[in-house]
């Protein structure tokens, strides 16, 4: 099903982006990975190329910058010969509750997580429309659906990604372009980073109890 498909994967230098890129290459797709972490990005792409059977390249991108997105996607489409799929995991997280989130962290997460989604989707849409259709897969988060007190700005940004995805899906469907979002939960690098800040079981349980807005969490 994926053999020969032409795919761009953002955030490909680690975590879900890396896993997504490798899975596509293993399925026989031709992939261009993109990230800001160039050393890791090149290394992962080279490793994926060796395992195959698909092919993989790497291009630097800053998803929050329109010129960077436009330039990198143009290069990728030339390499691939077109664009069938955009997988967009690229995101950033900074922990802070609603009372203490800084303007700087808020702006950073919305610039990368929300504006980055809008920019990459718009550019991908342009190329897909020209070739008759395609699929855009945004990466939302369970945090965008339920309260995440320790990640207030991140949760808000992912909620915005969900809303954008619904809007783009309803708008671009007429052009044979599907826009969907997947919502990862626990086993991600962001989760493990958060877990390192709370090593005791009691602290972990307290964290999840605090996710219940009126603090009525129960044990059974």
Question: What annotation goes with each model-predicted range?
Answer:
Residues 141:
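Residue(s) in the substrate-gating loop at a strand-loop-helix junction
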Residues 97-98, 105-107, 208:
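Substrate-binding pocket helix/loop in short-chain dehydrogenase/reductase
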Residues 27-43:
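Conserved glycine-rich Rossmann-like NAD(P)H-binding loop of the short-chain dehydrogenase/reductase
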Residues 99, 146-152, 174-175:
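Active-site loop immediately N-terminal to the catalytic Tyr-X3-Lys motif
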Residues 121, 157, 165:
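Active-site helix of classical SDR
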Residues 174, 181-182, 202-220:
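C-terminal helical subdomain
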Residues 126, 170-174:
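Alpha-helical segment proximal to the catalytic Tyr-Lys
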């Amino acid at each position: 099903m994926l053999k020969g498909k032409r795919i761009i994967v953002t955030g490909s230098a680690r975590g879900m982006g890396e896993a997504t890129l490798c899975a596509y290459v293993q399925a026989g797709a031709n992939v261009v990975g993109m990230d800001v972490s160039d050393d890791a990005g090149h290394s992962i792409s080279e490793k994926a190329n060796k395992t195959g059977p698909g092919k993989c390249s790497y291009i630097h991108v800053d998803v929050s910058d329109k010129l960077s997105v436009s330039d990198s996607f143009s290069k990728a489409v030339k390499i691939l010969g077109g664009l069938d799929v955009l997988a967009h995991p690229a995101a950033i997280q900074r922990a802070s509750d609603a009372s203490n989130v800084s303007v700087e962290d808020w702006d950073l997460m919305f610039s990368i997580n929300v504006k980055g989604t809008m920019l990459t989707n718009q550019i991908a849409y342009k190329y897909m429309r020209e070739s008759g259709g395609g699929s855009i897969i945004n990466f939302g988060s369970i945090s965008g659906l339920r309260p995440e007190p320790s990640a207030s700005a991140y949760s808000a940004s992912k909620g915005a990604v969900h809303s954008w995805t619904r809007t783009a899906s309803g708008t671009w469907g007429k052009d044979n372009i599907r826009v969907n979002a997947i919502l990862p939960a626990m086993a991600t690098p962001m989760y493990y980073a958060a877990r390192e800040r709370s090593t005791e079981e009691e602290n972990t349980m307290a964290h999840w109890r605090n996710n219940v807005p009126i603090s009525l969490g129960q044990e059974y």
